[in-house]
């Protein structure tokens, strides 16, 4: 099953609050300290911090590192580091040597580790045999690279709901489609836009449709395979921003039928500073190098412009690469490949449903959404507390409850502003703040952590 399929099957439902003494979906005891939250909560509650359980144990390489007592509900910004990543880095550190630049044993080992990492990440993403897997710094870097590789005269189609990383790198004449009201409407909008762009042409101009797999604001999943099919019907290509989808569900380029995929290591339980652009080789090999310098060249002559650029990933990876980042990311990819991802997904969906149910019941809290309330989504929820400044709420959650989450417009200003306006209409509240809060969960998240947030939201100031 592809990531989208998994996303589709995992619809959030509204469960009953857990009974005291019961187990959460990961088999951890559900906190009995926090009472189920409802709109009719008594006026006074104990504000003392609730003890937080450790991350669920027993998954070995996919245990996440963290600081005891700190509740990380900000996985969508940066996920904690998985043990697999930390171990891979620790193992390689004594072998520290140059990559692609030395004949010594250390250097050869590092070069091999780097190229193996490329292979493993490519396998994880289900690349086709002739696709390139290019290491970048992050998703932003990957999408900027793809923008630079657009053939001349190429057009881009995207949605106003995208993260800035998938809005801003594209040419100024990019078609930015309005935020659709449903997954089906998104597919229809792409179809209509491409028909319009192709009208009166011979259909050969390059067009790229670039869309996210899961929204960083709402967690909602986009109909990736259907969008890619719509693009291909019109002879266009499809780029998937999988920064938020890949940490939660399988992303397989071949199965989804997409042409390019971009991910960030730091959202995939690996360290900062590594990302990937994977996909069709032809545009990438024809484009000027994204970075110029050592490693991107085949030959350099005496004259300034006498340069033969390399083909393949090296063309866009000038300079000494981020070996440890690549190896750490590959280790996480391997660990994720060898576990039952459907089970992980189901566990996360149950926790997400608990979080959303609690948020829906908390006083004055309004959730943000683009599609219907039951549309498939990954472990991300954005919301506002009516009458409260979101930055102040976030600061209070951090200071008083040791809960880390995100506030603001989440680098998706057009979407976040629109959803805030819609939330005001839907809730009938005139006192919604101009920015939002976002809670996001993943591998190390527990019911107790979610309950702590719900308890904090239910506690009067
Ligand atoms: C959907 C989406 N795309 C792209 C990005 C950019 O990722 P990075 O900051 O790792 O480049 C993010 C980051 O939050 C994101 O959520």
Stretches with model-predicted labels:
Residues 4-7, 23-461:
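Pyridoxal 5′-phosphate
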């Amino acid at each position: 099953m592809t990531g989208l399929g998994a996303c589709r099957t995992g619809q959030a439902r509204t469960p009953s609050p857990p009974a005291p003494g019961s187990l959460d979906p990961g088999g951890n005891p559900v906190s009995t300290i926090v009472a189920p939250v409802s709109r009719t909560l008594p006026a006074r509650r104990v504000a003392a911090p609730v003890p937080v359980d450790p991350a669920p144990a027993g998954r070995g390489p996919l245990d996440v590192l963290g600081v005891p007592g700190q509740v990380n509900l900000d996985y969508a910004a940066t996920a904690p580091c998985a043990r697999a990543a930390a171990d891979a880095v620790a193992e390689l550190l004594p072998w520290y040597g140059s990559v692609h630049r030395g004949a010594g044993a250390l250097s050869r080992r590092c070069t091999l580790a780097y190229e193996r990492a490329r292979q493993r990440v490519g396998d994880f993403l289900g690349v086709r045999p002739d696709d390139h897997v290019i290491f970048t710094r992050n998703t932003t870097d990957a999408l900027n690279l793809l923008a630079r590789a657009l053939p001349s005269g190429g057009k881009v189609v995207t949605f106003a709901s995208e993260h800035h990383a998938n809005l801003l790198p594209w040419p100024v004449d990019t078609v930015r489609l309005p935020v659709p009201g449903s997954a089906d409407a998104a597919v229809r909008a792409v179809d209509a836009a491409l028909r319009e762009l192709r009208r009166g042409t011979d259909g050969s101009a390059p067009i790229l449709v670039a869309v996210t797999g899961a929204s960083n604001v709402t967690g909602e999943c986009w109909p990736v395979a259907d969008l890619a099919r719509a693009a291909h019907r019109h002879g266009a290509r499809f780029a998937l921003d999988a920064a938020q989808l890949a940490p939660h569900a399988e992303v397989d380029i071949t199965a989804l039928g997409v042409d390019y995929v971009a991910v960030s290591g730091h959202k995939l339980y690996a360290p900062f500073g590594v990302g990937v652009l994977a996909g069709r080789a032809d545009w990438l090999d024809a484009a000027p190098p994204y970075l110029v310098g050592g490693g991107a060249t085949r030959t350099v002559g005496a004259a300034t412009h006498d340069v033969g650029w390399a083909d393949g990933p090296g063309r866009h990876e000038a300079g000494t690469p981020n070996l440890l980042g690549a190896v750490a990311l590959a280790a996480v990819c391997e660990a994720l490949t060898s576990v039952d991802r459907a089970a992980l997904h189901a566990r996360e969906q149950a926790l997400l449903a608990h979080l959303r149910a609690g948020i829906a019941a908390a006083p004055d809290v309004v959730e943000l959404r683009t599609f219907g309330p039951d549309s498939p989504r990954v472990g991300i929820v954005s919301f506002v507390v009516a009458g409260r400044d979101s930055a102040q709420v976030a600061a209070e959650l951090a200071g008083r409850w040791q809960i880390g989450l995100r506030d603001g417009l989440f680098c998706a200003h057009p979407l976040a502003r629109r959803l805030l306006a819609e939330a005001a209409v839907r809730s009938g509240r005139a006192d919604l703040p101009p920015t939002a809060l976002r809670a996001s969960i993943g591998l190390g998240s527990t019911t107790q952590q979610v309950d702590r947030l719900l308890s904090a939201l239910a506690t009067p100031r």
